[in-house]
Structures are given as C-alpha cells and as structure tokens.
C-alpha cells in the first residue's frame, strides 16, 4: 500500500505541473486542483515554478501579463496624442488695407486658429456658478461695442462744430478705429470779450444810435448783420480801443454786401455817416441835363447846329455872312460856361463825393485786413449771440416784425 501511495503522489505531481503550465489564469491559481488522492497541490506547484520549465511551456515571467500590454499600449497612445493636440500654427494671408485710385496697398495678416470648439471647452471648464455666455458676447466684445457706439455719437456731434471757417486751423482726431486714426482740420474762433466790449462801446455813439433808431424795418441792421460786425472786428486784428465809428459802418456796409446787396439801403449809411449833405452830392451821370437848362436858349439852338458847322467848316470860313461867323464864335463860350457851372457847384457836395470815394478805399483795406474772409457761418453767429443772449441788440429780429 505504501508503494502504491507514493506512485499516485508522483503521478499527481506530474499532472499538477502540466495543468499549471498550460493554464496560467489567476482563477486557477486561487483554486488549486486536488489530486486523486485528495491532497492539495498548491505547495507543489509553487516549488516547481521556480525551476526550469517543461518543454512546450512559455518561459515568460508573470509580469508580462495582459495588464503590462495594456500599459504599454496606453503609453504609446499618450505619446501620440500630444502630436494631434498641438495647436496649428497661424496661417498668414494678404488682405487689402487701402484702395486709392488704381493703387492698392496690401498688408500681411495672421489667421486666428481659435475655433468655436475651443470656446465650448473653455465654457465647460467654468465653475457651476459662472454664466457660460457665448464667445461673441464676451467682455471684450461688449467693451468694443460700447466704445463704437460712443465714437459714432461723437462723430455726429463734431461735424456741427466744424462748419465755421475761422482764422486758425488745428488738427483734431475725428475717428479712432483700432490702430488707425483719422484726422480732420478744425478752425478755432478768435472772437474775444474785447471785441464784444468794443462793439458795446460803439453802440453808445449818438450817430449809431440815430441810425439804429431810424432802421425800423431792420433792412440794414438786423441781429445777424450786427453779429457779423463783431466777427469782422475779430478778423481785422486791430486793438479794441482803435475801433471807431467809421469801422462800425465799414463792417456793416461789408456785411450788407455779403448778405443783402441792396444798393438803396446801403446808400442810407452815407446819409447818417456824412449828415444831411447826401442830398447835395452831385449826380455826375446827369451833367449834360443840368448844363442844358442853365444855357441860353439861343446858345442851345446854336449848339444843335455844331455838327452842321463842323461839316461846313470850309464854307464858314469863306462865307461872308456875319451871323454864321457870330454863331461859331459862341462855341468856345459854351465850353467855358460848362466849366464855370461845374465850379459853381456846392463845395460841400464835392467834398462829400471825395469822402465817399475815401470810404470805398477804406472798405477795401478793411476787407484785406481780414484776409478777404467776409463769409460768416450761422454757427459762428449763434456763438457770438450766445456770449450775451440778453443784450437788446439781439432782439432786432425780422421774424418778429411779420
């Protein structure tokens, strides 16, 4: 019986070796098979694993299991993934920056590699309490939209201030878009408080007071024409104390030239400037009419015969008729009387005419002192009136008369 037991034990050891080498699954290791004799084979299998393996058995160590293979595969995938996740380099394109006539200016611009997927990933990583607003409603976009609205409002307000042609010019920013800035020319008003004081001082002059009181229809001196006088004072560049009565009428005459251009109303300026001598100014366009009435009727009759006498000059010299020679001798007398009549005119009338000529010359010099800029914009006139809106001069409005 002892021999048979030893034989069965040896056979069980051999069969245990074969089963453990061919079935390396961990479930078999945890539940070792029992031999036919009923004894466990766990200790025998552990002792045999350390020795040389039988033929046909895989000699790979237990660390080369499926878990190791999966680890190697995962490491290989992790090495390949960074190559796929690298952000593509931004591409470069050429875009049109400016088109002027037939010339086109190009500039190089990079294309942004940011996609909507990146915004979605960013929003998914935000905290639960943060509002994942869409990318086009970000803070930068909102600030840009607010800035653009403010720039459009400023653009609507600025052109109203730019219309006035004023002496000095400066450059101001009209629009700022990104890194581009558009400049425009703007004139600065030179109307100072000194010019308003000089104008108010001249209003106290008795002649100017009488003139403004006479112009009840406001044909020559309404509020806009008087505001142009202040604008001309500022453009002429004279000191405030140097402006006198003549400068007031010069500026007013020039303002009527620009706006009204009514000769009859402008002649009234001479009437008040040179007192009542305007009625005595000679009418040089009708000198022959005055001379004809002042001549002797016989002389006027002989004067009508002058062309006939000139044609028959040769006959007159030979003619013995004394009446014809007597009429010819009166022709120089008519010329002398015409010269005497011209000198017998009122000396004040001739003086007033010379004053009118001098007035026109001074008006031209005053116009040149303003750099030949006589046009005044409505915006500048309103600005001048806004300096002292309660002044009695600004109540001279033609709209109130109708």
UniProtKB/Swiss-Prot annotation:
Residues 16-39 have a biased composition (Polar residues). InterPro entries: Speedy. Pfam families: Spy1 (PF11357). GO terms for molecular function: protein kinase binding. Residues 1-89 are annotated as: Disordered. Residues 76-89 have a biased composition (Acidic residues). It comes from the Eukaryota. Belongs to the Speedy/Ringo family. This is Speedy protein E2.
